[in-house]
Design a protein with these regions (language model features):
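Membrane-embedded helical hairpins/re-entrant loop segments and their flanking transmembrane helices
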Residues: 141-212
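Membrane-embedded alpha-helical modules
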Residues: 2-109, 219-327
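Membrane-interfacial loop-to-helix junctions in multi-pass transporters
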Residues: 66-67, 128-136, 166-175, 209-213, ...
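Alpha-helix initiation and N-capping motif
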Residues: 119, 178, 197, 228-231
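Helix-loop-helix hairpins and the membrane-proximal interhelical loops
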Residues: 54-59, 88-173, 296-299
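Short alpha-helical transmembrane interface motifs in multi-pass membrane proteins
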Residues: 60, 138-142, 181-186, 240-244
Length: 327
C-alpha cells in the first residue's frame, strides 16, 4: 500500500499533461458510470446493509430499515428546498442527524462499542510490519491507475457541479498527488488505500460548497475521530439504514453530475457510439463479472470494476475515431 501510494502520487505529475484525454464526453461518462454503480450500494444500505450477513438477515429490507432511510431523505429535501443559508447547505447532515435520533428512539442503536472505546489513542506506524511483496505491489499499482482515472472524473465533476467550469490541469494533478500521499500515509499506519470519494461529487453538486476551508475542517474532524476513538465509535454506531438514506441522495447526485457534464457534448454519431460502447462494456462487465471467469484474477478484478473498461474504451475511441461536425 505504501509503495502503491507513492506510485499513485507520481501519476499526479503526468495526469495534467493528459488532460486532453479527458474531455467532457470522457469525464462525464466516468462520473456517470461511478454513480450508476454506486446506486445499488445505497439501496442495500437503506435496506439494512450491503454485506452478505446483513442481506441474509430476515429483517433486511423491512419497513423499520426503509423508514429510517426515508426520514433522512425527506428531512434532507425539506431542509434543502425550504430553508436558506447554512441550513440548506447542511441538508444531508441534518437529515442524517434526524435519522440517527429517530433510530435511537426506536431502540435500533447499540452504544456498546462507544462504552468500550478508549478516550484517546495514538496510531502506531508499521504495527503489522513491512512486507515487500512484488505481486501485491504490482496489483496495487494497477489499481492506482484505476483510482487515478476515478480521481480525474471526480475532480471534473466537482468543478462542474460546484463552480460550473472545467477542472484545471493543476487541480487534476494536485488531487491525484494528494490521493497517492494519503494512500502512502495509510499504509504506514496499517490503513486501507485511499481514493477520491465519489459521493462528494453529489454532495458538492447539491450544496454548491467546494471550499478548501470546509474540506480542511472535515479532515481535522476525521483526525480527531482517529485520535479520540469514542467520537469515531459514536459515528460508527449509526445504523446503516440511516447512512443509506443519505448515500442514496449522494449517489444519485453523482450520476446527475455525470449527466450534467454530458449535456455539454455535441451528440453526433461519433460521440453517441463512444458513449454506447463504453457504457455497455463498463456496466455490462460490472453486472456480469462471471463473463470474465477465464481471465487471470487480477484482470477480473480490474475489468469487473466497470470503471476501467468504460474509461479505457472512451479514451481510446475518442482519440482514434474521426471527428464529425454535425449531429
Amino acid at each position: 500500500i505504501f509503495i502503491g501510494g507513492l506510485f499513485h502520487a507520481c501519476l499526479g505529475f503526468f495526469i495534467g499533461r493528459l488532460r486532453h484525454w479527458f474531455p467532457p464526453l470522457v469525464s462525464g461518462l466516468v462520473i456517470l458510470v461511478i454513480g450508476i454503480e454506486l446506486i445499488p450500494v445505497g439501496i442495500k444500505y437503506a435496506a439494512g446493509g450491503a454485506a452478505d450477513f446483513q442481506i441474509n438477515n430476515p429483517a433486511w429490507g423491512d419497513f423499520s430499515r426503509w423508514g429510517l432511510a426515508l426520514v433522512v431523505i425527506i428531512v434532507a429535501l425539506i431542509m434543502k428546498f425550504m430553508t436558506t443559508g447554512i441550513l440548506s447547505s447542511a441538508a444531508i447532515l441534518i437529515g442524517l442527524i434526524a435519522g440517527y435520533i429517530i433510530a435511537i428512539l426506536m431502540g435500533q442503536v447499540n452504544f456498546a462499542g462507544v462504552a468500550k472505546a478508549d478516550w484517546f489513542a495514538i496510531p502506531q506506524p508499521f504495527k503489522y510490519g513491512f512486507d515487500f511483496n512484488v505481486a501485491a505491489i504490482i496489483g496495487i499499482c494497477l489499481m492506482s491507475i484505476v483510482s487515478a482515472i476515478e480521481t480525474v472524473g471526480d475532480i471534473s465533476g466537482i468543478t462542474k457541479g460546484g463552480a460550473n467550469r472545467e477542472a484545471t490541469d493543476q487541480e487534476l494533478a494536485g488531487g491525484t498527488f494528494a490521493d497517492g500521499i494519503g494512500t502512502a500515509v495509510a499504509g504506514v499506519f496499517g490503513g486501507l488505500p485511499n481514493t477520491s470519494f465519489s459521493q462528494n461529487v453529489g454532495l458538492i453538486s447539491m450544496t454548491g460548497v467546494m471550499s478548501r476551508a470546509v474540506v480542511s475542517t472535515g479532515a481535522i474532524f476525521l483526525i480527531i475521530c482517529g485520535l479520540v476513538p469514542k467520537v469515531g465509535a459514536i459515528i460508527a454506531a449509526m445504523p446503516i439504514s440511516v447512512l443509506g438514506g443519505g448515500v442514496i441522495v449522494m449517489f444519485g447526485m453523482v450520476a446527475s453530475a455525470g449527466t450534467n457534464m454530458l449535456a455539454d457534448v455535441v451528440w453526433n454519431r461519433r460521440n453517441m457510439m463512444i458513449l454506447a460502447l463504453s457504457l455497455a462494456f463498463g456496466l455490462g462487465l460490472h453486472l456480469e463479472p462471471k463473463a470474465l471467469q477465464h481471465l487471470p484474477q487480477t484482470a477480473q478484478v480490474l475489468l469487473a470494476s466497470g470503471l476501467l473498461p468504460a474509461a479505457f474504451l472512451a479514451v481510446v475511441l475518442n482519440l482514434i475515431l474521426p471527428q464529425e461536425d454535425k449531429a
